[in-house]
Structure formats: C-alpha cells, structure tokens
C-alpha cells in the first residue's frame, strides 16, 4: 500500500443532511460504518477512518449535515468548517434529485472560501437520462463537479481518480511502477474521449393502436412472443426482448398502442402509464406509422413523446406494400407534418413480410452512436466561433451579445452550454441556427441536440 511520505492526506465529506454523505463514506470505505437512513441528520459526530483508494491510504471524514434549521446546527456547522480548513480535499455532496437552494449555494461558497480544493459531488444521478438535472447545479459556480449515484455505484471510479489526482497521489504510484506496466496501462491514441461503458441500447417501439408495433418486434427478434392481432390494443404491458448485433445488445420494448385521450379507459390508462415509464428508460424510440392510410393528428402527438423524453428517434413507415399514395406524396406529407423531426432517419418496411429489418437494426446502432457522441471542446468552439462570425448575434437593445465559449456537459442526448454575457438575449431562431450548424458539421442523425445559454458568472467561478 502506498502512502504519502508525510502525513496522510485528509478528505472531508460535507453537505446538507440526507444527501448521501454517509452512503458515499461507506462506499469509499467499502464498509457500512456510518448509519444511513432516509431521516435527515442521522450523522451528528464526525466519523473518521483510514481507507485505501486504489492502493493509497488516506483519512476520510464524514461530517454531520449542515442544515440551517437543524438541532445543534451552529455547533455542527462550526465543526464542519473546521474540518474543511484542516482537510486536503473537500467533497461537498448535494442531492441531484432536488432543486438547488440558496442556502445550499451559500454553504458551498462558504466552504469553498475556506478551502478552494473542493469538489461538488452531485449524488442520486441514477442514469444517463437524469444528467440534465445536474446542470441546475452550475449555479454553484464551480467547474469541479461530478455526477454520481452511490446507490447504483455510478461515477464512483471517476470520482476516486479525480480525488487522487487532486491530492497528487497518482503521481506517487506511477513513479513506483515499472515502465512496461505503465505502457500497458496507457490509453490508445485513438480511444474515445470518454470511457465507453458496456450498455444495452434501450429501444421503445411507439405508435397508435394497430399500426404494427408487435409485428415489428417479432420481425426484429424473430420471435412470436408479442401477440399480433387485427384487434386494436392487444398489447397491454410493455414487452421486453433483447437481441445481439455483433457485440452490441439491444433491448426492445413493445409498448401499448396509444388512443385518443377520450378513448382511454380502465386498463388502457394503466397501459399508457406503463408506456410512459418504458420510454423514461429508453435511449431510442421507433415511431411506427401506418402508411396504408393517411397520417392522423394522433401520430403527431405520439411523436412528441420522443421529444418529451429527449430520445433518439427513427421513423418506421409500416405497411409500405399497401401504401395509400405514391412515395413522393407520402414523403412530402411526412416532412410537413413532422417537420420538428427532420433530423430523424426514415425507413420503409412491411413488418409482416420482414422487409428492411436488418436496415432498422443497423440504423439503431448508428443513431445510438450519435446519441452518445461527445464533441471535443476545441472543435466545438471553433464551429460556434465560425457560425457567430458568419451570422453575428443580434444585439439586445443596442447592447452587444457575445458567446464567450461553448462546452458539452452531457451525452445521451448531447447537451451543450453557451456561456454568454447576455444569455436571455439568445433568440429561439438564432439557437435553431446554431443547432442546424452543429448538425451540418457533426453527424447527429436521429438525435435531439439540447442547447442552453448560461451566464458566465454562474457557469464558471473560481
């Protein structure tokens, strides 16, 4: 075990009650030492323990919650601030499922003032779709933030690596390793910017009743698990099926068909709720449209579910062999009625005859790669700079509107922040222009692109 040549490095875990401090302490210590519960303020004393992080011995402190209205709050706060002052690094934990409060921001900045070597740890970000919530914590004004889920063990390894780097402990172990071992540990030059987690692509099949969703599922999986019938609404519970394409697992969910709201009764209301929950876990939606008859208003409303859940999307035109009109007419109508999905790929098929099924499978993987894409920061800023030079931002009542820089803060879907002097002055039409520019420059096939404007002061404060 490696230790610092001097005294042990000390890490203090601070934050308000019930945000997961003790759970993180237990996770890092790999033992259930601190009491954890849903009751705010279970930790009152400072728990101290020597632990090993990737072979390095450090001292970990778990402190009592710093809530303003807590019993003994003054004493606890004083103790916490003393711990912050004496520590080499602070992990300030917040609840990612809650809205940041002014009190929490004030406490964080007070701690940061005492010890700037401080990480903002956003807990309870249980899956990729919840990362957008973490963006709200940019108001804390620190670039040193980490999204984790202690209960799901997500983001813990990245946090530990950052902790060791901040404490200059990784350098110590590297000096002790043989050069050949170090070479074998190095990341190849052509590796992705982010470590790619082994993940199953979750695909929701959506559409109104009797458009052929179950037939599509059967064709994709080559099974007959999903009941196919001419009777509308034979699928009630979402049905999961997993297939393997190369080394990539894809899980399909055949959701219940959606009717007009006025026709939703009894068990179909339950089915609609299950459909919504299934989409919450999905990465990509296959929107199945029946082209044996003209599109209806409900098709457009259902397509909005993909936008609501920020999903990648592929349009599946089923029953193409008995289409109601020529190709050109259908495509023109599709473009007019679904203009907000102009980035979505379109595939024609006849599910019962299993036409173009392999194309759908490979398109899912292609869209998922776009959905997971991260643009290098330098390249992103180069494109944004060129776009603003080509078409300058409109002024705000005669005052200059400027983009300082851009950064992609999340994937699945890609989410980009523009750090500006007047974020509220960014007009919707100019935002759309920038999004279209990014789509043209980078391949975001079938992928929603989220662009937010933030104030420089709130987004980046040392």
UniProtKB/Swiss-Prot annotation:
Say if the entry is tagged with keyword Lipid biosynthesis.
Answer: no
**EngA-type G domain location:** 9-171, 201-372
Residues holding GTP 2? 207-214, 254-258, 318-321
Write down the Pfam families for this protein, in alphabetical order: KH_dom-like, MMR_HSR1
Keywords tagged on the record:
GTP-binding, Nucleotide-binding, Repeat, Ribosome biogenesis
Cite a single GO BP annotation.
ribosome biogenesis
What's a single GO MF annotation on this record? ribosome binding
Keyword Nucleotide-binding listed? The answer is yes
Binding of GTP 1 occurs at: 15-22, 62-66, 123-126
Q: Which domain of life is it from?
A: Bacteria
Question: Hey, which family's this protein in?
Answer: Belongs to the TRAFAC class TrmE-Era-EngA-EngB-Septin-like GTPase superfamily. EngA (Der) GTPase family.
**Functional summary from the UniProt entry:** GTPase that plays an essential role in the late steps of ribosome biogenesis.
Q: Which PANTHER family match?
A: GTPASE DER
> What is known about its subunit structure?
Associates with the 50S ribosomal subunit.
User: Which HAMAP family does the UniProt entry name for this protein?
Assistant: GTPase_Der
Task: Report the protein name in the record.
Answer: GTPase Der
Q: Which organism is it from?
A: Helicobacter pylori (strain P12)
């Amino acid at each position: 075990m490696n230790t610092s040549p001097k005294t042990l490095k000390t890490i203090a875990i601070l934050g308000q009650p019930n945000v997961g401090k003790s759970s993180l302490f237990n996770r890092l210590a790999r033992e259930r030492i601190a009491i954890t519960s849903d009751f705010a303020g279970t930790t009152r004393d400072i728990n101290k323990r020597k632990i090993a992080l990737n072979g390095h011995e450090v001292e970990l402190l778990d402190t009592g919650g710093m809530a303003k209205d807590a019993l003994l709050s003054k004493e606890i706060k004083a103790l916490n601030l003393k711990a912050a002052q004496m520590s080499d690094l602070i992990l300030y934990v917040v609840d990612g499922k809650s809205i940041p409060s002014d009190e929490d921001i004030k406490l964080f900045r007070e701690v940061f003032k005492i010890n700037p070597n401080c990480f903002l740890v956003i807990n309870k970000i249980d899956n990729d779709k919840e990362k957008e919530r973490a963006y709200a914590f940019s108001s804390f004004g620190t670039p040193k933030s980490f999204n984790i889920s202690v209960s799901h063990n997500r983001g813990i390894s990245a946090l530990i690596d950052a902790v060791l780097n901040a404490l200059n402990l990784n350098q110590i172990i590297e000096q002790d390793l043989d050069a050949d071992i170090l070479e074998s540990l190095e990341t190849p030059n052509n590796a992705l910017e982010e470590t790619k987690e082994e993940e199953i692509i979750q695909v929701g099949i959506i559409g109104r009743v009797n458009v052929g969703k179950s037939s599509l599922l059967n064709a994709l999986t080559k099974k007959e698990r999903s009941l196919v019938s001419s009777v509308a609404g034979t699928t009630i519970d979402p049905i999961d099926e997993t297939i393997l394409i190369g080394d990539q697992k894809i899980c399909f969910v055949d959701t219940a068909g959606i009717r007009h709201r006025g026709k939703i009764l009894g068990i179909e209301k339950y089915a609609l709720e299950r459909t919504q929950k299934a989409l919450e876990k999905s990465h990509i939606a296959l929107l199945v449209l029946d082209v044996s008859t003209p599109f209806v208003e409900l098709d457009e409303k259902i397509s909005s579910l993909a936008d609501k859940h920020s999903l990648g999307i592929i349009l599946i035109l089923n029953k193409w062999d008995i289409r109601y009109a020529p190709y050109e007419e259908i495509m023109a109508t599709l473009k007019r009625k679904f203009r907000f999905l102009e980035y979505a790929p379109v595939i024609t098929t006849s599910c019962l005859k299993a036409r173009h099924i392999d194309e759908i499978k490979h398109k899912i993987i292609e869209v998922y790669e776009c959905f997971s894409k991260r643009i290098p920061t330098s390249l992103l800023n180069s494109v944004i700079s060129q776009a603003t030079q080509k078409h300058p931002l409109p002024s705000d009542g005669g005052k200059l509107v400027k983009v300082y820089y851009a950064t992609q803060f999340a994937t699945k879907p890609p989410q980009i922040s523009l750090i500006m002097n007047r974020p509220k002055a960014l007009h919707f039409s100019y935002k759309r222009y920038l999004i279209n520019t990014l789509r043209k420059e980078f391949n975001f096939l079938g992928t929603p692109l989220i662009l937010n404007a933030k104030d420089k002061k709130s987004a980046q404060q040392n």
